[in-house]
Amino acid sequence: MMLPLLAVSAFASLGAAQTYTSCNPTNSLKTWSLSTDFTQGSSDGWTAISGNVTYGSNGAEFTINKRYDAPTLETNFYIFFGEVEVVMRAANGTGIVSSIVMESDDLDEIDWECTGTDTTQIQTNYFGKGNTTTYDRAIWETVSSPQDEFHTYKVVWTAAAITWYIDGTAVRTLEYADAVDGKNYPQTPMVVKLGIWAGGDPSNSEGTIEWAGGETDYDEVPFTMYVKSVNIINYNPAASYNYTDKTGSYTSIVASNSTTGSGIHSSNSVSVFAPSSSTSTFTSSRALIATASTYPASVQTSSSGVVSLSSSSASSSSAAASSTSGSASAVFTGAAVTNLPSFFFTVFFALAIALAF
C-alpha cells in the first residue's frame, strides 16, 4: 500500500499504514486462533481506530458518508506468523479502496486492496521495514465482481513464505529469499486492520489518485465495504513479543510467557511445552519458523535454540529438552536453572575440602 502520510489523520490509518504504528507489541493473541462473526455484532478482539463501524446482516459495515471518512478496525493483539482469513465484499466508488492490512511496529506489511471501479482484480502487496524505494511489489490477482459478491481472502504467513489465497485457491507466493534475501520480507509481529479510504481524494498525489481509479466524487456517497467474518491463527501464541535488537529480523524476536500447550518444537522434533504455571521464553538463530503443513500439530523451528522454563513443573520437558542435539548452544530446564546455585556451592565446597587436605 505504502502511500505518503495524508494531511487528514482519518486517512492515515490505512491510506498510509506504513507511516503509523502504536509501537506496543505487548498484547498478543494468547490462544491458537480467534474467529469473529461480524454478522453477530462487534467483537472485543477489535477496536475502531478511526470512524464509525456499524453491524448488520452482512457483517461489519465500513461506510464513507462524507469526505475524510475512513472507518477502520484493528485487532487488540499481535500475531507472530500465522493465518488471516477475511470474508469481504469490497466497496463501489471511484477512488474508493477497500483494504485488509497486516502491519507490524517495524513497518512490515502484507496487504489486500481492492479499488471501487476494478471489477475483475484485487491487489496483493507487501513491504519490509518501511522500504519504499521501489513500488514493484504489487501484483493484481483475478477475482470476480469483488464489489458485488463476497469472497474469502486469506494469507498464510510463515518465516519461509507468504501465500495469498482467493476462495481457497493460492494465487501468489512470496519466498523469503525472493524479498532481497529476506531484507524486505515481512517477519515481525503484526496487527490486522480492516478499513475503507478514499485514495481518490483530491488532496492525494496524482499517482495515488490514478492508482485508486480516479478522483472520488463525494456526491455519490455512501460507499460501503462489508466484512462478514475473520479467522485468525497465531502460529506462536504468547503474552508478549520483545524486540531484542534493531535488526528487524524474526530471529531477534522473543516470544514471552507462551501459553499452555503451544508446542514449540525444535528441528529434531523434540517438544518443549510451557506449563501454565511457568513462564517461558524461546529464542533461536532461526527462531519460530511455522509451516502450514505442520500446523497445528507443531510449530517447526530449526536448531541453535535456547529454551528456559522457570518452574519445577517443567520436569516433564527436562528429559526431552536434554536430548536436543545439533547446534543447540544451551538448553536449561526449570529444575536445572533452579538448582544451579546449589550445584556450584557443592562443587566449590568439595574442592575446598580437597585442597585443605
Curated annotation (Swiss-Prot):
Membrane spanning stretches: 337-357
UniProt binding sites for chitin: E113, K193, W197, T208
One Gene Ontology term of the molecular function aspect: hydrolase activity, hydrolyzing O-glycosyl compounds
Maturation-removed propeptide residues: 327-357
Positions where lipid (GPI-anchor amidated glycine) attaches: G326
GH16 domain: residues covered: 20-220
Active-site feature positions: E109, E113
Keyword presence, rRNA-binding: no
EC nos: 3.2.1.14, 2.4.-.-
Glycosyltransferase is among the record's keywords: yes
Subcellular location: Cell membrane; Secreted, Cell wall
Gene Ontology BP annotations: carbohydrate metabolic process; cell wall organization
InterPro entries assigned: ConA-like_dom_sf, GH16, Glyco_hydro_16_CRH1_prd, Glycosyl_Hydrlase_16
Gene Ontology cellular-component terms listed: plasma membrane; side of membrane
Glycosylation site residues: N52, N92, N131, N242, N257
Similarity section: Belongs to the glycosyl hydrolase 16 family. CRH1 subfamily.
Designated name of the protein: Crh-like protein 1
